[in-house]
Amino acid sequence: CGICATVCPSCIIEMGPEGPHAISEMSCMSCGHCVAVCPTGALHNTRCPIDEQDPIPMETLDSKTAFNFLRMRRSIRNFKPELVPEEKIRQLLEVTRYAPTAANSQGLYFIVISDKEKVRKIADLTAQWMEEQIAANSPRKRYFVKTLQIYRDRKVDIIARNGSQLIFALCRRLNTTGISNCEQAWAYAELYAPTIGLGTTIMGFIQTCAQEN
């Protein structure tokens, strides 16, 4: 029917007398669209084998349910001292595999820190970076001064929020869309987290410090 050729984002599928064929396999981005849209399940792509696909029989969410699901996402800034089990961390990160990446480039990886002392050290290093920014008369100076007053003088962990675990989403420097890909992946994780009993937030100070160093 030619639907696969129509939806192929790389425009490498053509219809021949014996059906669809790839005119440039090297240009395939492994997105799997061709396999997904085939109405008869007849298309096989070596990069997305049909026998490895698991159809998901579910009704499309109505717009109100979908809207409310997205609205319910909240940043959690008060964390319990207990560590989240590794199994749940893996479950959380599994969903990030299905987040969109530009040109299906993927190439993301994660570092999980499950050590309260290491998290505290990272928060302290971030505070030191803020002090350096203040000394350098950064445009963010006034904001950092207030933050450090809370962190240093009042002993309130406004940087890591007393969290016991951190997850860093990373990409290679040469990946020009890597940062936005990481953000998309983490958005998936944040939306999924409450369904498995977890709370998350984006540690903005730590993120900015890491990106600038």
Predicted regions located by residue number:
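Glycine/small-residue-rich phosphate/adenosyl-binding loop
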Residues: 112-182
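Specificity-determining recognition surfaces
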Residues: 6, 55-90
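Non-catalytic interaction/regulatory modules that flank or connect domains
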Residues: 95-101, 108
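Short microdomains enriched in Cys/His and/or Lys/Arg
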Residues: 22-37, 53-71
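PEST-like low-complexity intrinsically disordered regions enriched in Ser/Thr/Pro and acidic residues
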Residues: 57, 77, 93, 117, ...
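Iron-sulfur cluster-binding cysteine motifs and their immediate structural context
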Residues: 3-20, 33-50
